[in-house]
Amino acid sequence: IYYGTKYKDDSAAVRIDRNFDRDRFVSFSFNYTNNWDGYPVVPRDYRYADRFFSGQVNIDSAAGKKHGPINPGFRNKWWYHGVLGDYTTSITRNLDVTWQFKKDHDLPSYVRIFRTRNDYSDAWIKNYTYPNYTPSGNVTPAQIQDWLKTYTGGFSVSSYQERSNGLDFQFGKNIGINNILFGMTVSHDYYRRVNPSARTRASISRNMFTSYLQDKLKIGDNFEITPGLRYIHSDDYTVKNGGGKDISPSDSSVSHLSGMLSTRYKLDDTLSLYASWAQVFRAKRVTDYDATLEPLDDEKGNVYNIGLKKKIGSRTSLDINFSYLKMDNAIGAYSVEDASTATGTKSYAMNASQSKRALNIGIDHRFNENWRLGISYSYVKTHYHAKHFTTVPDGSGTSLDDLLSKQIPMNSYQFDLGYDKGKFSADFLTSIYSGNDENFFTNKRFVVSDLTLNFKITDSTSVYLVGNNLWNTAWENRYYYHMGKGAFPQPGRRFLIGIN
């Protein structure tokens, strides 16, 4: 039995629009979600279930816990947390009000006020006196359930709060061949974390200002070029630790100007070319300062894109696109086991150079008024190079560069066959993921098919049937070093019937 896998999701959304004329309106929206999720977060590894319950899988940090690749069955610890009744929650409350006061040649001008509230919590049972946290002897789930009936120790709840209040402004103006957009955003961001079991807490806040200016120049009927600038400024972070002392990291204040340029040229009615370049810059967020024990650098680099669109006859179209991303610094946190810490893990700052090449080819063809087919191919090649260390610092000798660069399928193919007739429509989509490194995936390739059927009863009502993963393929598109291969499978075969 998968104890602890229950979940509950509640949500509500309200939107009110008041249109004054074709170009002016006021819009109010509020979104609310409340999610409660039990464990486990990964499926059981049945190969090592007996090993886990006989106490051979060490998940206790005090005794030097190890993860999946060098401690088979480690991910079963999350099933154990499900048995104990641990859970996570998330609540979001997002509000915004938008006033569009002008629209000039499809260039909107508006003011938007927003407020976001995100609250997260992790609840862990406080007292692991039975079966002493690490299963030993021949512990059974039933024995643990019996013990829980008499447990009165409660849960240790860690909480995380994210807040952002701000204002967006955009002004659009057409002047001859110039289509100008100017915008800016001011916000105050706040993050708070409380971990009672580790007796730590932190509050981090920051003021941010971003602005952009772009001009789409239409030169004749066939050529357009769009230069643009983006400016970002953020104040020093104010970090308040558990003792109440305020700290402003000396490198946290940021001012940066970046540029972009895009162009499109129409050779004739059937062929057009396009290209773009943009500088990438992302300043450290409030959560970046709290997520790692090591310093992170701002993220920066360049992205280039080139492509063509071609009509072949009256029924076929071709789209080819190539992009290249070159990051001088890509940031992130990388967590590994460290028995010397209270939690048994340590987060390392992952400042790395990154290059990413992607090729996308798509062909759409309509056979007649009823049948159509879309075929696409995507190739992605990513290479990370960590700057501060080359192997995972856990003694396993694993290459960090390989680990980061080979965690997604390299090739993907999609075949989308569609049928439309009167009130009935159908789509049969098959996706093939290949080029998977079997050090990180359970198979070199995965084939997944989905089917969608739709029938329109009236102009406002339709019924539908959706079938996902028709072949019930066991597949995954993610790898996480802690848990080992196959720890994040995608959903199996399922069907959904509904009315719109």
Label each residue range with its predicted role:
Residues 177-181, 185-187, 201-327, 366-368, ...:
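Structural signature of Gram-negative outer-membrane beta-barrels, strongest in the C-terminal barrel
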Residues 2-3, 79-86, 94-98, 151-158, ...:
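Extracellular loop and loop/strand-boundary signature of outer-membrane beta-barrel proteins
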Residues 17-21, 33, 215, 275, ...:
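Conserved C-terminal beta-signal and adjacent last beta-strands/turns
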Residues 1-90:
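Periplasmic-side early beta-strands and strand-to-turn transitions of outer-membrane beta-barrels
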Residues 109-114, 118-126, 266-282, 298-374, ...:
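Membrane-embedded beta-barrel scaffold of Gram-negative outer-membrane proteins
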Residues 32-36, 115-119, 175, 186-192, ...:
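Transmembrane beta-strands of outer-membrane beta-barrel pores
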Residues 19-33, 73-79, 83-243, 266, ...:
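Face-selective signature of the C-terminal outer-membrane beta-barrel domain
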Residues 220-221, 225, 324-326, 349-439, ...:
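Gram-negative outer-membrane beta-barrel transporters
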